[in-house]
């Protein structure tokens, strides 16, 4: 499977080759997910692909040296490489600037573990108001809302009439499951979305994709979303765009103790103009335009 998530797309699904041509209309989210998991297993058997291979690849890359990842904006900040030691925390090391440091490294606190090497600016104040994205985007000056995603920088920008309102780091698709590039539009929002394909590592619990905003459905019916997820400091998703969601991490892993990073929620509520009243899938007939450009670092 190419990546992304089968998600709640709300249309009929045709069974794969070798199975009688049958179209099932699945009305409940739970039944749709069960069917898609079964469909995925059949695909995996027929092509001899093991889902565990993806998990092993993720585990192998989890501790990669962040100093070796090159972003174009690295040249604008003087920094040095530092390896985190046992007992150290970003809060203790950088005080009130810890959030600036994690954003600069495109990493969350759960993944800032002992043994990881991170980029540390020689002057922490250089990171104040840091963003690798343009403050103005003339192409979107007529758009009330516009989303720019730069894969080369691993950053997302939310624009209002061409002016940058806020920016946030992302985790895009890894090498084998790249995030699609081009022009898209947000077509659906789902506050309590979850994956129908992937589980929380080491469990049988579906991976949460909270505050999900759908921007693309490919020909195979695979949905691509912007949503909350782990942000390990490098492209690691199956094609979706991941944003900080420390509350989800607290619920699933027990850390961090005091969640603060909530970029997924912030973007979600910006698009909707406030909090969602419930957990139903919300269609966005005229959602904001999304432009994805660049190439993710390897």
Predicted regions and their residues:
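Bacterial Sec-dependent signal peptides at the C-terminal "C-region" and cleavage site
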Residues: 51-61
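Exported/periplasmic cell-wall-interacting domains
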Residues: 61, 197-298
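Intrinsically disordered, low-complexity Ser/Thr-rich linker and spacer segments
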Residues: 67-74, 120-144
């Amino acid at each position: 499977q190419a990546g992304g998530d089968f998600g709640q797309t709300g249309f009929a699904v045709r069974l794969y080759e070798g199975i009688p041509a049958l179209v099932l209309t699945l009305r409940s989210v739970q039944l749709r997910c069960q069917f898609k998991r079964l469909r995925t297993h059949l695909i995996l058997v027929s092509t001899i692909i093991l889902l565990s291979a993806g998990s092993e690849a993720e585990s192998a890359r989890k501790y990669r040296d962040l100093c070796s990842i090159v972003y174009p904006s690295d040249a604008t900040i003087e920094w040095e490489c530092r390896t985190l030691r046992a007992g150290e925390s970003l809060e203790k090391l950088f005080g009130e600037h810890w959030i600036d440091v994690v954003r600069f490294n495109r990493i969350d606190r759960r993944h800032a573990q002992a043994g990881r090497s991170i980029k540390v600016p020689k002057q922490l104040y250089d990171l104040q108001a840091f963003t690798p994205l343009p403050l103005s985007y003339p192409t979107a000056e007529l758009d009330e809302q516009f989303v720019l995603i730069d894969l080369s920088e691993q950053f997302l920008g939310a624009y209002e009439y061409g002016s940058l309102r806020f920016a946030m780091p992302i985790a895009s698709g890894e090498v084998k499951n790249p995030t699609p590039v081009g022009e898209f539009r947000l077509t659906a929002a789902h506050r309590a979305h979850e994956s129908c394909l992937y589980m929380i590592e080491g469990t049988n619990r579906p991976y949460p994709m909270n505050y999900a905003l759908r921007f693309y459905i490919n020909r195979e019916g695979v949905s691509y979303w912007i949503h909350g997820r782990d942000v390990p400091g490098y492209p690691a998703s199956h094609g979706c765009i991941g944003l900080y969601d420390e509350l989800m991490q607290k619920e699933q892993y027990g850390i961090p103790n005091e969640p603060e990073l909530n970029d997924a929620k912030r973007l979600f509520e910006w698009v909707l103009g406030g909090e969602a009243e419930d957990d139903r899938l919300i269609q966005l007939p005229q959602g904001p335009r999304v432009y994805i450009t660049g190439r993710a670092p390897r």
